[in-house]
C-alpha cells in the first residue's frame, strides 16, 4: 500500500472548513485509496453511536431500524465521519488493525500490530469513516 506524507495533526484530511482539526471539521476526506504514513487503518466490526446522537437519530427516524441505518450511512457519506450534525457527537468503534503507517511503526514504544483487535477511545466525530457493508448487519439497542 503506497503511503503519502500527512500532517501530524490529521489536517491533511480536512475538506471543510480548511485550517481546523478533524473533530471541528464539517467534512473530512475518507478516501481510503489514499493512506498516509501517520494513519492506522482498521476494519471496523462494530460502531457504538453515543447516546445523545443515537436518541436524536432514532427519534428523527421514528424508531425504524432501517431508516436509522440509512441515516447513519448518509451522515458518513456526507461528512466523511460519524458526527451527528444535530448533536455534534459521534461514538466509538471496535475493530481489527488492517494497516499501520510507516511513521507509526517506527516510533519507539509503539507496539500495535496488524491483526490486533482495537477499541477506539477517540470519538468518531474526529475519526474518518468509510462504511462498506460486506455482510448482514444488525442494530442492537442496549
Where are these predicted regions, by residue range?
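Long terminal accessory regions outside catalytic cores
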Residues: 2-69
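Conserved protein kinase catalytic core
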Residues: 52, 105, 141
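Short amphipathic alpha-helical surface micro-motifs
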Residues: 5-11, 21-27, 75-80, 102, ...
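Single conserved hydrophobic/aromatic residue that forms the stacking wall/gate
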Residues: 131-142
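Glycine-rich beta-strand-centered segment in the early N-terminal region that forms part
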Residues: 33-48, 59-124
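Short, Lys/Arg- and Gly-enriched loop/turn segments at beta-strand edges
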Residues: 53, 125-132
